[in-house]
Amino acid sequence: NIVERPEDLVGQVDAAAVDHRHGKYHLPAAEALLEAKMPLFIDKPLCYRKAEGQLFLARAKKLNVPVCSFSTLPKQASYKAFAKKLKQLGEIQTLVATGPCDIKSKWGGIFFYGIHQVDMIVRLLGCDISHVQGSKGKRKNHSAQIAYSNGPVATMNLVGGASAPFHLSAI
């Protein structure tokens, strides 16, 4: 269904997908649908500011409305094969995720593509993160280091200076 306003979907569909190029528009577009208790898929990133996302998800929990948001990269066969091999390695020391990212993107900067790497990393190593540090490069390439409480370190290579496919490596 094509509608002029998100709330016009209420009564026409059983669930909705909310998708904008910039994540700051996702939750405002989803609010009326949430209040109508409509199950939601919200494209990545779920939101642009953490506090806004926490309030939205707390409201969804209170209303008992299912909400999901994720990168599609972990659904790909190559990612699933990597995850399976990773489990066979035993204790992981380091994980490196590389992919495209323009931190000055008009569609939300690092949130636009960086979320793909974050999603892949936390699915593989979990959320028990003790420290995160970003390093801004002199040009368009940057990195972020993620330290885990149980030992592993993940690095995100945010490549803005060339066309870089998403990929992972681990030790």
Residues of each region from the PLM?
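Rossmann-like dinucleotide-binding domain that binds NAD(P)(H)
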Residues: 97-165
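Short, intrinsically disordered, charge-balanced linker/junction segments flanking boundaries
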Residues: 1, 165-171
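Short acidic low-complexity segments
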Residues: 2-12
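Beta-strand-loop-alpha-helix segment that lines the small-molecule cofactor/substrate pocket
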Residues: 15-21, 27-71
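Short, Asp-centered acidic motifs that coordinate Mg2+ and/or phosphate
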Residues: 14-15, 94
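Short loop/edge segments at beta-strand edges and connector loops
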Residues: 4, 42, 71, 133-136
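A contiguous active-site-proximal alpha/beta segment in oxidoreductase catalytic domains
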Residues: 47-107, 117
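Short beta->alpha connector loops
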Residues: 21-24, 46-47, 73-75, 137-139, ...
